[in-house]
């Protein structure tokens, strides 16, 4: 029974689904056909219970009731039952109320009033279909009623009056102001699209501004705006909607534009010349006014003038200032003029503005000068002091009557009219703070009236100041002068001269004086005080050092006493108050310049040293000292004793050295230095460990039989010569000359012999190494002979910088299709470029546009097969080659390294130009098991001579197709034999002429060297020395005979 219930339920659900799918909500919209004048109903069916959105529209401001009903809604459920339709939303149950109504039975929607789009641009009506129980039979439907816009709103400007400023002479298209207007009509509609237009301009004339039709931006039309012509413009701007159409609405606004002033006008003076007069010795705060004319706006820096005196004011008598109210220049006299010096003064006045000129006229400005003549009027002048102040100095040490009688000096006035000393004047002391001075009323002599204190408060920095007045008896004019008196400082520790009396000869007299320095004021300055003309003319004093001087005279003195006043000043320019007197007694002298009647036993004249003892001798006038000293017996004995001690001193030293060492006592034993210490001198006479003996005498190479297998004897001798070396970070910096001679014999297949000769020079930094025990005498002799041999060879060698001509340059390939072998290029190994000579490597770098790293010097071992079975027929290959070598030698001077050098070698490669004998045909044995028609491409570093045997490849690649076999030979300390029984079955087969192969394609590329059979150490005794061979590559093609 359960399945029956389930079946019934499923059938019921299926029935409901079918019923729901087939139901529909129909909306009918009534539209008016304007062209035909008919009204039609359009039915919109909603399938699958989906409501269609209502798209009806109404025009604002119109009576739309003639279009009722504007819409009709209907549900397909009304077929089976009674449905009531209801609507809600704005215009129905929300403001504005009562706009729309609906027939609940038929679903017709009517509009009942006029609508305004600016208030409600869109009405949303919610429609419902209800059954008798008030239940929704459908989901509510939302209808949108759009209100169509009409042009019922004019544009409105944001401001009624716009105010803007712009500078005169502005560039064209300069923005002045931007106008803005709004329209309440629908956005992005023609009814709200506003167009701007200038209706009028005041003052009238040429249009100066323009307005953008769409943006409302007001801009200048040209750069002719001039504030001096019109300082204000009024514009009437209109804004019209509907893009300025005639049927559009519009409004207007005012735009007031003020033209701002710029400094584009040059100021000029009102007159072309000016003149004025002034009495001499007078000042004036306003001698003359100069009016400047400027067309710029008054009261601004563009209008305010700036005056300057261009010329004529050499004495700085005048100044000129600007009156900011009137813009006049006021010429002032700031320094008294003198008619006698300048009766007429001619000035040049220039004017400009305080503000910088506008860039449009700045380059046109030139300052013009206006002449101004100033006439100086002569007047009766009184006395004057010239200079206005005078300085007097007071000698130190003056006291009492000497101070009262001392005349400081004379300070008189002059008559300004004549320039001579004034006559009808009297002098009086003016300002005198200490009342110390007095002046003669007629002569102007100034003296002290009383004594004063050196440390008085009226003395400032050693200067006492007072004033003196000169009064004209006739006019009563008064002139004032300033007196400055230098008061010397009181020195409590003044330098004192030794005052003992001294005797001098009457002719060519001189004496040395000394100063007692109590205050450490040296060095001292000496001078003879000019108390009388005789003293100053006769005596002269010269300083010897800081504390002494020599007093001399060149005249002949009269016998008698002399008093010479000398003033001594210390390093601070301080001296005693009174000059010091040196007492001298002039007397007649004998031939030895000794005073005849003086109590002094001896005196030196003509020299700077004065001595009061006669044991030292005398000095003549020509400066030759005549000694009065005699050698007594005691002196002679001391000299003999000194000589004896000097002779006995070596014997005394010898006795001290031969004395036996005491068994005990401090310093009698020495600690022995242990053997092997750093300070021990070794018997091998070099630093470091004991040298190792080596046998290097085997320089002969035994011959090897043709059938001998795996036997290669070698020997090699190298010598190293270093020069100019210095230790740098554990290495030796200098020049290395490596010379090596090696011989080797060996057997390869049918046999081959060769000789290796090497020479290389290395300049650079070499590592430090331990010297070995070699027979240096033998090596020196050997390499000396080799050096001479090389020198002879170099002399006989042709120049290597010219074109070499050979007898046979070769011929073209007999095979015409040799150019077709370009396909081999792709398979060639280009690594040989890395081992090119530096000159060729530079060319390769230029061609390849890349930098080629030098090929590393590594050690390689090349096997040599010496005993291979003959497994097949013999093939003969004719090969010939030539080898061209060149040699370049140079000598480099040693230079000190500017900075530590890294370890490394600089290799100088030597090449030679020789010719070898003709190469005989060689026999190469190939394995018969390998099929014929095999191409062998061989890259040869240098021709191989007298080589017979098989050229073999490793056994593991013997049966491999497309094999590329490269073989490189690099100098190495040990090269084993090339023979190997393991690869005997991988020998190369015959070669066909023309380069065309049949059968297995085995391509073998081999690089060979002339020393390929040498099995020996090719290095040098220096661990940092490396040899490089720079050879050329050549291609050798084998052909079958």
Curated annotation (Swiss-Prot):
Residues 1014-1041 are annotated as: Disordered. A component of desmosome cell-cell junctions which are required for positive regulation of cellular adhesion. Coordinates the transition from proliferation to differentiation in hair follicle keratinocytes. Plays a role in moderating lymphocyte migration to inflamed skin and maintaining homeostasis of the epidermal inflammatory response. InterPro entries: Cadherin-domain_protein, Cadherin-like_dom, Cadherin-like_sf, Cadherin_CS, Cadherin_Y-type_LIR, Catenin-bd_sf, Desmosomal_cadherin. Desmoglein repeat repeats lie at residues 884-910, 911-941. One of its GO terms (cellular component) is plasma membrane. It is linked to Defects in Dsg4 are the cause of an autosomal recessive phenotype lanceolate hair (lah). Lah mouse pups develop only a few short hairs on the head and neck which form a lance head at the tip and disappear within a few month. They have thickened skin and do not exhibit any growth retardation. Residues 50-634 are extracellular. Keywords: Calcium, Cell adhesion, Cell junction, Cell membrane, Cleavage on pair of basic residues, Disease variant, Glycoprotein, Membrane, Metal-binding, Repeat, Signal, Transmembrane, Transmembrane helix. It is a single-pass type I membrane protein. Three calcium ions are usually bound at the interface of each cadherin domain and rigidify the connections, imparting a strong curvature to the full-length ectodomain. Residues 1-23 form the signal peptide. GO terms for molecular function: calcium ion binding. This is Desmoglein-4. Interacts with JUP. Strongly expressed in the skin; during the anagen stage of hair follicles in the matrix, precortex and inner rooth sheath. Residues 24-49 form a propeptide. It comes from Mus musculus (Mouse). Residues 50-157, 158-269, 270-385, 389-497 form the Cadherin domain. One of its GO terms (biological process) is BMP signaling pathway. Its main location: membrane. Residues 656-1041 are cytoplasmic.
